[in-house]
């Protein structure tokens, strides 16, 4: 209702002006020609205002709808690229046992923006604070590490650890530990934008394994794989910015 008080007020003023111009009572009480001319102008404005207001509102709704449509299309494309990235980066592995997601900051925590192979898992709605979990550590690295190291992935090659170690080393809560027990390994890559000598954090690209280990577990520490992940993360960063997804 708060969005409509201005147009309602203008329409109300127009009604009053029309009454003063067209009734005997109005002619008796408003005899000044200047005032009556002003009232005519006001009533004309009030008459066209609802149409103008409706047009503006419709234009706003259209722009909002278009923005949401472009965002949906961009997210669909990002999911397709996540699927392709799994196949390319982890060539020879079973792609159905590898998940991928992009997390962005929301209210001081990371949330999943889009993902592949994890939509029906309990950890799909997980939220991670700064420095918590593999993705939270990647967030911290993107902001605090030396510039030459900010692109380096954060790796958890074995996540089947004791509750105490997961609390102490990865700063996970008991709830987070419970919903990620099925995860076997995680690799998280910072996504950031270079701005001169500074970086702007955009999000985190993560891959993880479920159901069965990788055929080649040593590949997670391969420098070439890390570079490939960083290149993919950089591309996703450009997509986040070009499609205005973070705003």
Can you describe what each PLM-predicted range is?
Residues 99, 186-188, 204:
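Short hydrophobic/aromatic beta-strand element in the GNAT-like acyltransferase core
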Residues 198-247:
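Juxtadomain coupling helices with adjacent low-complexity linkers
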